[in-house]
Swiss-Prot record:
The keyword Glycoprotein does not apply. It is found in: Cytoplasm. CDD domains: ASS. Transmembrane segments: none annotated. Keywords: Amino-acid biosynthesis, Arginine biosynthesis, ATP-binding, Cytoplasm, Ligase, Nucleotide-binding. One of its GO terms (cellular component) is cytoplasm. It comes from Rhodococcus opacus (strain B4). ATP binds at residues 8-16, 117. This is Argininosuccinate synthase. The keyword Ligase applies. L-aspartate binds at residues 119, 123-124. The gene is argG. Homotetramer. GO terms for biological process: argininosuccinate metabolic process; L-arginine biosynthetic process; urea cycle.
Length: 399
C-alpha cells in the first residue's frame, strides 16, 4: 500500500482543493474522511463523491451524529458552555470528534500523515493538531492552507485551473461550518464590523423581526442533566437538538453576531445560528438554579467559564478539562425535572419550573401568613455576616 495522507474533509473549498494539491506536491495518495455531524441539508453521499471527483483514492463517511450529541453536545449542555458568555462552541466541540475518527481512519487505511484545511489565523489548526498530538503523536501533520498561505482567491483560482468541483465563488465568499449543534458563518463583507448580516447569511433560523408566528410553548424534561423528553415525548439527545432546531429556528431563536477573541490573538467576527443549543443551555441552566445548592452552583459557574475556554482553545483532551468533566458530571446527579418555556420573536422566555429534586421551599420563601422562616435569626446573622466589613470601615474612617 502506498504511503497515504488521511484528510479531514468537509466538502468545502479548502479541503476540496487540498486533495488535489496534496497529491501533486507530495506524491502521496489521499484518503478523505468526512464526518456526519448532522450538517443540515447537506447530502453526505454528495460530499463523499465530491472527494473522489477531486482525486481522493478513497472517501469515507462516518455517521457520528448520535456520538456527537451524546459525548460532545451533552457535556456542553451540562457545562452551560458559552465562550465569552455567548458562543455555544458550535465548531469547537466538533473538532476533537473529527480528530478521533481521523486517527482511527489513519490506522485502518495505512495513513502515516493526517491533514486539515485550516488557516493560520484560526483556532481550528490548534484544535486539530493538539488533538492529534494527544491521541496519535506518531502521525505527521500537514496543513497546506496555512503552510502555503493560501487565500480564498488563490484557492478558487487553483480549483478553476484544475477543474475541481466547488460550491463557492468570489461573489459568494462566505466560509461556513455547520453541524447539528449550530452553524458558523464568517469572511466576506462580514469582516467589516459595521455591515449588518443580510438574509442570505442565515439558514437554520427565520428572521425574528418579520412574519412572527404564534408563540411556541414547550416543556423540556431532564434526568441527571440529560434532556429526555419534549412535551412528554421521549427523545434522545440528538432528537432533542433536532426538534428544538426546528421549533426554535422557526421563531428566530439562536442568532448570534459575535466578535470573539481567538486563541491566536486576533479578534474575529462570526455569525452563529444555534437555536437548539441555546434553548437547551438556557433550560438546563434554569433547572440547575432550582436543584443545586448555592455554593455548588456558584463554584460550578466558575468552572463553566474555564471549561468553555479550554474547549475553545483546543484542549478537549487536556488533564484539566478531563478533571472538570468529572466534577461537572457529579453536579448533574440531581438536575432532574421540567422546564416550561416560550419561544417567540427570537426570545427564550422561561415561565415554569418543577422538580422532585427542587431546593425551593415554598413555605420558607413565601411572604404570606404561615411561612416557616424564623425571622428572629436574621438580626444576628446580619451582624455576623457584616462584622469584618464594619471593623474595616471603622479603621478606614478613623472611628
Amino acid at each position: 500500500m502506498a504511503d497515504r495522507v488521511v484528510l479531514a474533509y468537509s466538502g468545502g473549498l479548502d479541503t476540496s482543493v487540498a486533495i488535489s494539491w496534496i497529491g501533486k506536491e507530495t506524491g502521496k495518495e489521499v484518503v478523505a474522511v468526512a464526518i456526519d455531524l448532522g450538517q443540515g441539508g447537506e447530502d453526505m453521499e454528495v460530499v463523499r463523491q465530491r472527494a473522489l471527483d477531486c482525486g481522493a483514492v478513497e472517501s469515507v463517511v462516518v455517521d457520528a451524529r448520535d456520538e456527537f450529541a451524546d459525548e460532545y453536545c451533552l457535556p456542553t449542555i451540562q457545562a452551560n458552555a458559552l465562550y465569552m458568555d455567548r458562543y455555544p462552541l458550535v465548531s469547537a466541540i466538533s473538532r476533537p470528534l473529527i480528530v478521533k475518527h481521523l486517527v482511527e481512519a489513519a490506522r485502518a487505511h495505512g495513513g502515516t500523515t493526517v491533514a486539515h484545511g485550516c488557516t493560520g489565523k484560526g483556532n481550528d489548526q490548534v484544535r486539530f493538531e493538539v488533538g492529534f498530538g494527544s491521541l496519535a503523536p506518531d502521525l505527521d501533520v500537514i496543513a497546506p492552507v496555512r503552510d502555503y498561505a493560501w487565500t480564498r482567491e488563490k484557492a478558487i483560482a487553483f480549483a478553476e485551473e484544475n477543474e475541481i468541483p466547488i460550491n463557492v465563488s468570489k461573489k459568494s465568499p462566505f466560509s461556513i461550518d455547520q453541524n447539528v449543534w449550530g452553524r458558523a458563518v464568517e469572511t466576506g463583507f462580514l469582516e467589516d464590523l459595521w455591515n449588518a448580516p443580510t438574509k442570505d447569511v442565515y439558514d437554520y433560523t427565520q428572521d425574528p423581526t418579520v412574519n412572527w408566528q404564534a408563540p411556541d410553548e414547550l416543556i423540556i424534561s431532564f434526568e441527571a442533566g440529560r434532556p429526555v423528553a419534549i412535551d412528554g415525548k421521549p427523545v434522545s439527545v440528538l432528537e432533542a437538538i433536532q426538534e428544538l432546531n426546528r421549533r426554535a429556528g422557526a421563531q428566530g431563536v439562536g442568532r448570534l453576531d459575535v466578535v470573539e477573541d481567538r486563541l491566536v490573538g486576533i479578534k474575529s467576527r462570526e455569525i452563529y445560528e444555534a437555536p437548539g443549543a441555546m434553548v437547551l443551555i438556557n433550560a438546563h441552566q434554569e433547572l440547575e438554579h432550582v436543584t443545586q445548592e448555592r455554593e455548588l452552583g456558584r463554584y460550578k459557574r466558575q468552572t463553566e467559564q474555564r471549561w468553555s475556554e479550554l474547549v475553545y482553545d483546543g484542549l478537549w483532551f487536556s488533564p484539566l478539562k478531563v478533571a472538570l468533566d468529572t466534577f461537572i458530571e457529579k453536579t448533574q446527579e440531581r438536575v432532574s425535572g421540567d422546564i416550561r418555556l416560550v419561544l417567540h420573536g427570537g426570545a427564550i422566555i422561561v415561565n415554569g419550573r418543577r422538580s422532585n429534586e427542587s431546593l425551593y421551599d415554598f413555605n420558607l420563601a413565601t411572604y404570606d401568613e404561615g411561612d416557616t422562616f424564623d425571622q428572629s435569626y436574621a438580626k444576628g446573622f446580619v451582624q455576623i455576616h457584616g462584622l469584618s466589613s464594619k471593623v474595616a470601615a471603622k479603621r478606614d474612617l478613623g472611628l
